[in-house]
C-alpha cells in the first residue's frame, strides 16, 4: 500500500509494488494488479481481474469479474 493512501485489497488479491491505486478503491478476490498499472479513486475491481502494466482505469469506474485490462488500454472516468 502506498503511504497515505486508503484503499482495500482483498487478502487473496495481489497488487505489485509500484501500482498506483486511488483512495476509496476496492480490489476483490483473486485479482492481480501489475506494478505499472494506474487505478483511479473510488473504483471497484471485481473478482479475478488482471490489470496489466501500462493499463489505466479512471476514477469511479468498475471492472467486472473475470476481465483483463491489457497494456495500453485506458478506461475513462465513470466507466461501468
List each model region and its residues.
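Left-handed beta-helix
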Residues: 10-11, 16-17, 22-23, 28-29, ...
